Amino acid sequence: TQLKERRRIDFIIVDSAGKTTDEGIKKLCLVSDAVIVPTSLTQNDLLVTYQTVADLAPARTLNPRLRIIILPNRIHSATNIYTVRETLKNLDAIILPVMVPQKNLFVNFSTLDAENEYQPIAQAILNNLA
C-alpha cells in the first residue's frame, strides 16, 4: 500500500530469481501493473514459465490490471519469432514480439552496441506498460 501512495514512482523492478511462490513477490503482484517473465525455449525453462504463470494467477484475480508479460530470452539467432510465439502460445500471458538473443560470452564488449541492440526490447516492454 505504501507503493500505491507514493505516485512519484513510475516503475519498480524486482528480480524474483524465479521465486514466484515467495510471499513478498505475491504481495508485490497485488500492487503491480505488470510482471515480466523471461524464458528460454528449453524444456526446463518452459516448465518453470508455465508454473510461474499459474502461480501468478491468483494475483490477477485480486488485481485485474496485472499483466503477465513473457520475454523470450537466450533465443538462438536461427530461431524466428513465429517459432517462439508458437511454442509459447498456450500461456495465459502477453508474449512480447521481440527476443533477447543468445550470446557467446566474451565476444562483444561494447556497451554502445548492447544499448542499440536492446532498445527494441526495452521499447516493447514499455509499450505493454502504457
State each model region's role:
Residues 1, 17-21, 41-42, 76-78:
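Short beta->alpha connector loops
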Residues 5-25:
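Switch II (G3) loop of P-loop NTPases
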Residues 22-43:
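Inter-motif core of Ras-like GTPase G domains
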Residues 1-12, 32-34, 44, 54-62, ...:
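Catalytic phosphate/metal-binding cores of nucleic-acid and nucleotide-processing enzymes, i.e., regions
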Residues 47-74:
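Conserved C-terminal guanine-recognition region of P-loop GTPase G domains, centered on the G4
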Residues 111-130:
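NTP-binding/hydrolysis catalytic cores, primarily Walker-type P-loop NTPases
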Residues 13-15, 36-40, 69-73:
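Conserved beta-strand segments of the P-loop GTPase G domain that flank and frequently precede/overlap
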Residues 74-113:
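Beta-strand-loop-alpha "switch" segments that mediate conformational coupling across diverse proteins
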